[in-house]
Amino acid sequence: MEYRVERDTMGEVKVPADRYWGAQTQRSLEHFRIGAWRFRMPLEIIRAYGMLKKAAARANLELGELPEEIARAIIQAAEEVIAGKLDDHFPLVVFQTGSGTQTNMNVNEVIANRASEILGKPLGSKYVHPNDHVNRGQSSNDTFPTAMYVATVLALHQHLYPAVEGLIATFEEKARAFDGIVKVGRTHLMDAVPITLGQEVGSWAAQLRNTLAMVKEAEKGLYNLAIGGTAVGTGLNAHPRFGELVARYLAEETGLPFRVAENRFAALAAHDELVHVMGALRTLAGALMKIGNDIRWLASGPYGGIGEIFIPANEPGSSIMPGKVNPTQVEALPWVVVRVFGNDQAVAFAGSQGNFQLNVYKPVMVDAALESIKLLGDAVASFDQHLAQGIEPNLERIEEHLNKNPMLATALNKAIGYDKAAEIVKKAIKEKKSLKQAALELGYLTEEEFDRIVVPMRLAKPHENA
């Protein structure tokens, strides 16, 4: 392998000749191989950094802080970072300095060398300097949290929201299709008064819509960026208008309302906005766990379970039991939820660990958040495509359970009173008789009265046509 010599304030470092990174990235590679098999800095952060460095170069050009030739080359190189053309030049891991300095310098060095190359200068020449030019008016302490928030917002919009909204649409369509199917309601895992299958599925759509709205509301906090705060929040070495311009250019680049944080001291020292978003993601994940468990129970069987719905049989379920089919999508989804719950705890703890002017748990916080967003998006899309869209009612089983449901006696409360209705239920259960038969034998109602009062659809929709 051929090498070139790069230099930083600590001396000379050998860097692979075909890599755009420089001395500080190489030092990090040598000192931090922690979790390299898996925990590479997320490319979402790199893309966000590309947007940030492009916006910074535009701002510095407008403010007269950079020569036009240098600024234009930085912008072109940053656009290549955004497009993913330079992904192989970002090898660092999540487990590094807590401010993300090494990743910031990785981006600075790659853009500086690529910009120098664009201008016809050799790699390592520092014709475009990683600190003086690419990082002008910036610190890792304000750029990394800015990239964190931009990356997280973009991940929500690109990975999570479309998947969840697709599942909501599927459930709403199923709810309309199943609205005329009356079934047993269940509370405490016990039989309760009837509902329609459409009402049950519709409740899943509503729960997801509510929890997704919580995530979207929490997301608004991430629009407040630390950029312009530099090292401790004072804005030292940055033009007074720099942060405002960068935020404006980021908003233009993304189409999202990014702005400078009202208090940049707090924006460096704490990341409560990200903690809030993770809490909302945990709530959404909890809703998915509940819905998944409902579906797993309702589809259980084929003979020993509830079996009121059919779900797609996607693959054989057992290596020893022929013909067995398992609800695999409903099992994979809760595992993702468990992962998100764990990540929420990691982000919550890391968010509490700011000291004075800086929180130094930034990389692990954003890695956990991005993993959660992407896992949830993937799991929900898979669940929708391979399970939810294929849910169908088992009408025979639904009717069987409904006809045996003793809680239909609730309809008799107004006619004969709670105590007599309870007596009918006890007799029906004890003697394994239908509710109607027990009522007639006790003499509390005639057959005509029973049939007029106990109408399952009216119990499921008591206020329609009232």
Curated annotation (Swiss-Prot):
List of residues binding substrate: 99-101, 129-132, 139-141, 187, 319, 324-326
Record carries keyword Lipid biosynthesis: no
Matches recorded under CDD domains: Fumarase_classII
Catalytic residues (UniProt): 188, 318
Amino-acid biosynthesis found in the keyword field: no
Record keywords, A-Z: Cytoplasm, Lyase, Tricarboxylic acid cycle
Reaction catalysed by this enzyme: (S)-malate = fumarate + H2O
Residues of the site described as Important for catalytic activity: 331
GO biological process, one term: tricarboxylic acid cycle
Compartment(s) of residence: Cytoplasm
Entry GO CC: cytoplasm
Pathway assignment: Carbohydrate metabolism; tricarboxylic acid cycle; (S)-malate from fumarate: step 1/1
Main location: cytoplasm
Any one GO molecular-function label of the UniProt entry: fumarate hydratase activity
Known EC number: 4.2.1.2
Assigned protein family: Belongs to the class-II fumarase/aspartase family. Fumarase subfamily.
Function, in words: Involved in the TCA cycle. Catalyzes the stereospecific interconversion of fumarate to L-malate.
Assembly, per entry: Homotetramer.
Misc. comment: There are 2 substrate-binding sites: the catalytic A site, and the non-catalytic B site that may play a role in the transfer of substrate or product between the active site and the solvent. Alternatively, the B site may bind allosteric effectors.
Protein name as catalogued: Fumarate hydratase class II
